[in-house]
Amino acid sequence: SASPERFLSFDGRSGDGDIVSSSPIKGTASTAEGFLPKDRAENVMIVDLVRNDLGRVCEFGSVAVPELLAVEAHPGLFHLVSTVTGRLQPGRGWSDAIDATFPPGSVTGAPKIAACGVIDDLETEPRGVYCGAIGWVDADRRVGDLNVAIRTFWIEEDELNFGTGGGITWDSTPEGEWAETELKARNLLRLASGPALA
């Protein structure tokens, strides 16, 4: 996986409780100046969803947004990234944080439960690993980090696969979403089409 998106990190070593963090990506453009108002609106909507998800398991008043709408450069494109953090309630752990936040809000949309129902109704194939989470957890050290499984290849029956897509909002256009999907896929296609490794 070459995912640039953090789904959930967990750090219980701070001495200030168990800190969880999520950095959803919403908004993709070919230049740093190319973001549309819909990209910003979509990012803020998902930040609110993630704040709500974390608020279910974090101490009251601890959920914060230390970074909103940061522009990150990645090979061939730019993303809007925000970060949401919180301190888990006493007695809550890593599994509680995952239960409260999975699947990642950036790939479901909001409201999450209704959006998941629409996805189930409209998508003809299960997503599998795509849009899930990949990472590591060290229970002994009380740390972990999971990404959102975008920009991720998987092999099925001798075929190399990857998924890509875009979020549909009230002011999306089919042409704009298709262009965003192609932009996200461009480097993956280039990598998959390169010389085979022995």
Language-model-derived ranges and their functions:
Residues 1-198:
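Extended alpha-helical targeting/anchoring segments
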